């Protein structure tokens, strides 16, 4: 549980034992080396049944699996023995803060009692604060960045793919330019994600698609999936109310030169966003412990929710593949019927007029099947290019929120309790020194400086803890807007089915009407 108000020490839970078993189910398998073999995601385990279906999908599952592996293993976010995991997260409650520790702003300490605050969670001020944040984020907005693969691969020994990245609107804090296109590599996207994680560790930074799965770095289907994943990544970044204002994001989208060369020459800032910031005391007055309880509940359920949505997305992809097969089989059926009609005349030489009439109607059936194949193809393309993308985008959003929770558990610790105890001990020593004439002045001054330094550190850590709390609340609040993505994707799904079901019905009605004149007897 991500209990932001707990005074208990952070123990090493089973999910955080080591980078190897932080995701126990995310292990490389022999299947990783081939796309045609079954690759399992951390949440869609091999041979996991869903009714009569078995989710051993080799596409989306592999993509999510590799994304999780990159996030938790290759990035090495967790180091064994990390002190933060054993430290009190929010420090001691005010009742345990010694009032004699002058200079410490105890108003920033975690509040044990909420009696002085608004008893109800949704107070007017808090509601206004939340609404102002929610208005800054619209996950249903249209994509404003397009990512296209450049067919020619570069490199002498190791070939790499370049992407044409084009923004369709004028970006914040930039001048309108006739050239809104830049060329970027996968490594450039990776650099952007890394610097965003350094600057905004407690923001919803979307994950990148895997650079490769096994040996699939040149497979056309994999490259198409990766391009779509990169497009989802950059559009989620540019939709975020904070990330879209970042100078490095704007640089990524606007600097026309090679980004690798630019990085070597330029001096750019990657310091954490909280540097030199002070928490607004108005926010502290808005805080309510129930907010952290909501986060804990969301954190406890997020894996289960992610698993369910991935299953849904896998089944949508299967539907897309079935549409492709249906389209091909309808065309094949049309050709087979045409062949039958061409040869049927030899079987009925005595009834040439009748058989020719029948064959002309069979030709109508063949054309009808080709028309249905075209309809199935259009439906498949719409599923692939629009509907499936919306399902995957919601996966990216959930994983981004999960990343916030996980990074909090790893990076948000402090040692306020330890420092407080040390200040209390040193204060007692200082008082005993004052009554002891034999103590040297240098020793007294050194101890006093240590106390002052620890007080400053406590104040800084309390300030950072509140800034983190505010940041995560902002992210959780704007995340609430993504619930409408669920509505949107299912509305689009139903709309698409109605559209193509109507086309199919109309086509069958026309062919049925034409077949009414097909001979049933010699008369």
From Swiss-Prot:
GO terms for biological process: plasma membrane tubulation; protein targeting to vacuole; retrograde transport, endosome to Golgi. GO terms for cellular component: cytosol; endosome; membrane; nucleus. Residues 17-37 have a biased composition (Polar residues). It comes from the Eukaryota. Signal peptide: none annotated. Gene3D superfamilies: Arfaptin homology (AH) domain/BAR domain, Phox-like domain. Residues 141-260 form the PX domain. It is a peripheral membrane protein. Residues 1-37 are annotated as: Disordered. Pfam families: PX (PF00787), Snx8_BAR_dom (PF19566). One of its GO terms (molecular function) is phosphatidylinositol-3-phosphate binding. Keywords: Cytoplasm, Membrane, Protein transport, Transport. SUPFAM superfamilies: PX domain. It is found in: Cytoplasm; Membrane. A 1,2-diacyl-sn-glycero-3-phospho-(1D-myo-inositol-3-phosphate) binds at residues 185, 187, 211, 226. Its main location: cytoplasm. PROSITE patterns: PX. Required for vacuolar protein sorting. The PX domain binds phosphatidylinositol 3-phosphate which is necessary for peripheral membrane localization. Belongs to the sorting nexin family. This is Sorting nexin MVP1. It comes from Eremothecium gossypii (strain ATCC 10895 / CBS 109.51 / FGSC 9923 / NRRL Y-1056) (Yeast). The lineage of its organism: Eukaryota, Fungi, Dikarya, Ascomycota, Saccharomycotina.
